[in-house]
Amino acid sequence: MNFMACGMGQNKQYEEQSKKIQDLMKNIKYKIAVMSGKGGVGKSTVAANVAIGLSKKGYKVGLLDVDIHGPSIAGILGIRDAAIEFNEERMVPYPYSENLKVLSMQCLLNQPDDPIIWRGPAKIGVVRQFLSDSEWGELDYLIIDTPPGTGDEPLTVAQTVNGCRALLVTTPQEISLADVRKSIHFCKRVDLPILGLVENMSGFICPTCHTLHNIFQSGGGKKTAADFDIAFLGSLPIDPNVVISGDSGQSIAADSPVNAALDQVLENMITQLKSK
């Protein structure tokens, strides 16, 4: 076997796929990777509701879930049983609403509880295939939900999607802030611009009296953003109804106090993007 010829062939395919990705990304104005240093901070819930919120403002939005081992976007949006259609060899994202399309690994599984037992090269290949073989069309925003940490999936997005920016999600506790600091250093090392930081689970809204109680220490996200000279996009409180909505596949209710906080995050995010 001619190993050199084989390697050259693989390099050519890789380069062709990279060009294909860049050509497709030219049709998308803003690309945003939603990242967190650790799991359990509500990153996917933030990603889903940012996408929904932008779509309700009239923007054309795509939501791509590249959390290969723990995809949850389809569950949050209530489309676990939605099958991804194919146009020849291209994936057609699920039309969640008039302005929002969704693509998740979860929609490609035969059974929702099937585990995905893959090593790095397979995951990298699938993320690149999601980016190269999906029919998004023209979008204002592509929101990319990445798994927590600084592993293969966020690294692949950072190195592959030109013009991508990171939206970092943390909670107020120091254990989460320590990990989001690692994410900040990751972004700096791979030259991924940081759009801003969101502090999630910032206080608890009592379902009875509707007042905000700081069950964790608060303000850590804002201080971290200031320490690293990045934009602080806002705080999102805990509302038990948001958990119920997510488990039942619904977005944040219009009358939830979280909705107003989310809208402020969106406005800050849009302002940041327009200022770049």
Where are the regions that the model predicts?
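Walker A/P-loop phosphate-binding motif and the immediately C-terminal alpha-helix
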Residues: 31-68, 184
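Phosphate-binding/switch loop-helix module in NTP-utilizing enzymes
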Residues: 109-157
